[in-house]
Amino acid sequence: MDRLFIYKDKLIANSRFQNTVAKIPFLRRIAKKRANQLFDVMAGFVYSQILLACIRLNLFNHLKNGPLTLEAIKNKCGLEQAPLKQLLDAAVSIDLLEIRSNQKFGLGKLGAPLVENSALVAMIEHHTVLYEDLRDPLLLLSGKLKNKKLEKFWPYVSNDLEDQESLKDQDRVKGYSDLMSTSLPLVADQVVSAYDFSKHRCLLDVGGGQGTFLKRVHLQSPRLERMLFDLPGVVNLAAENFLANSEDQSIKVFGGDFFKDDLPSGADLITLIRVIFDHDDERVKILLKSIFKALPTGGKLLIAEPMAETPEHPPMGHAYFGFYLMAMGRGRPRTVEEISHLALHVGFKNIDILHSDMPINAQVLLLST
C-alpha cells in the first residue's frame, strides 16, 4: 500500500503529468479544484488582512442598514477612492461584501455575521499579536523564538516569577481577561444549547474569568447557585463587574491557582470552558484530579472547547490551534479520545459527547464521577 501511495505522490508531483491532466476534461476539474485549494492556503494571510482592514474601517456596521455607493462609503471611512475601491473589490471576491444594484456595495454572506459581532471582531483584532509570532515559522518550531508576543499577552503560561506574581494585579490580567469575556459568547451559546443546567443545584465554573459564562447560564437556569474560581487578579475584576447587577452579586468568587490550591466544595456540576487546551497533559491531570475531588458522587464535569480532528473542520484543531498554542508557549489541541483518556485516568466515567450546533467553536463533553 505504501508503494502505491509513493507512486501516486511522484506522479502528481511530475510537471509533465500535471500538464497532461490539465487537458483531460474530467481530470481537469479535479486539478482545478486542488489548484484553487492550494492557492487559498497560500493567500490566506492576504485574505485575513483584507478582513482586518474591513473591521478597522467598521465597514460591516456601516452597511448593516443597506448597500451604499463607493462615494458614500468613502465619506464614512475616510480612505481615498482608489485604495478603497481596491479593498471593496477584494472583499467582494472573498464573499465579505456583494455588489448590489446601481453599483452599490452590500454585506456578503461572510460579512453579514460580523455586524455588531464583538466576539468575532475581538478575535480578528487579536490575530495581529499571533501573526507577529508566526512571522518566521521555523524559528517558532525550533523553540528559539524569544520574547513571543502571545506569551506576554497570556501571562499565566509564563514560568517567569515576575509574570506569575503579576497575576495578582488586575491591570496585568485585564487585557487577556477582557478578550476571553468578549469572545466567550462564541462558545457559551453552544454549551447552553447543548445542556440543561437546571437539573443541577450549584455550578462551579473553573477558570471562569469575569463570569461571562455564569451570566449566560443564569438566563437559562435562574435558580442555579453559581461559583467562580480563577486567578486572584481575574476574580477581583469579576467581583467589581458583578456590583453592576444585583443578580450577579449572588455569584461567589474564589481566587487561587487551580494547579496548587483546592477548589471550593459544594457544587454538583463543574465546568471547564476553553481551559484545558491551554495546558500540557500533566497539568491537565492535576486539574482533573482536583475537580474529581471537589465533586460529590454522581457529580458532573462539563468540558467545552475547540478540539482536534473536529468533524467537518479538521484544520481548526491541529493547524490553527496547534500553531496558536505553540506560539502561546503551552498546551495543545486534543481529540475527544485524548481528553476522555485523561479524564478516565483520574477516575471519571460515563463520558458523553453532547450535540453542538457549531463544533468549530466548541465540542462539549459531559463526564460523571
Model-identified regions with their sequence ranges:
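Eukaryotic partner-binding/assembly regions in large regulatory complexes
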Residues: 1-16
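C-terminal alpha-helical "lid/dimerization" subdomain adjacent to the S-adenosyl-L-methionine
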Residues: 302-346, 352
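Conserved Class I S-adenosyl-L-methionine-dependent methyltransferase catalytic core
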Residues: 17, 21-201
